[in-house]
Amino acid sequence: SEAAFQKAAEEVKELKSQPTDQEMLDVYSHYKQATVGDVNTDRPGMLDFKGKAKWDAWNALKGMSKEDAMKAYVAKVEELKGKYGI
């Protein structure tokens, strides 16, 4: 639900320790897919490694519905809460 999604978006900022880069990419990409939909920007340039990684993670979800992305995002944040605590 939208409320669960918004709550998860707040809770992910309150984790006691920093998730791995890959975990954060998963969370970021599902957030973007849930809020924006399919990638709507050009892939960042060669030297923007972080930007490219984020874009690629988001682009990998192309075609996923916003609702499915929202559910997956909430599930991923729940998983991180269990692992890192809030």
From Swiss-Prot:
Report the superkingdom from the record.
Eukaryota
Summarize where an acyl-CoA binds, as residue positions.
13, 28-32, 50, 54, 73
Mostly located where? endoplasmic reticulum
Which stretches are transmembrane?
Answer: none
Q: Name one GO molecular function term.
A: fatty-acyl-CoA binding
* Cystine pairings recorded for this chain: none
InterPro entries under this entry?
Acyl-CoA-binding_prot_CS, Acyl-CoA-binding_protein, Acyl-CoA-binding_sf, FERM/acyl-CoA-bd_prot_sf
Question: What does the UniProt entry say about where the protein is found?
Answer: Endoplasmic reticulum; Golgi apparatus
Q: Could you tell me which Pfam families the record lists for this protein?
A: ACBP
Question: Mind telling me which GO cellular component terms the entry cites?
Answer: endoplasmic reticulum; Golgi apparatus
ACB domain location, by residue? 1-86
Q: Supply the alphabetized keyword list.
A: Endoplasmic reticulum, Golgi apparatus, Lipid-binding, Transport
Gene3D superfamilies per the UniProt record, alphabetical:
1.20.80.10
Any one biological process term the GO annotation gives: fatty acid metabolic process
Task of the protein: Binds medium- and long-chain acyl-CoA esters with very high affinity and may function as an intracellular carrier of acyl-CoA esters.
Record-stated family: Belongs to the ACBP family.
Q: What is this protein called?
A: Acyl-CoA-binding protein
Source organism (scientific name): Gallus gallus
Q: Which gene encodes it?
A: DBI
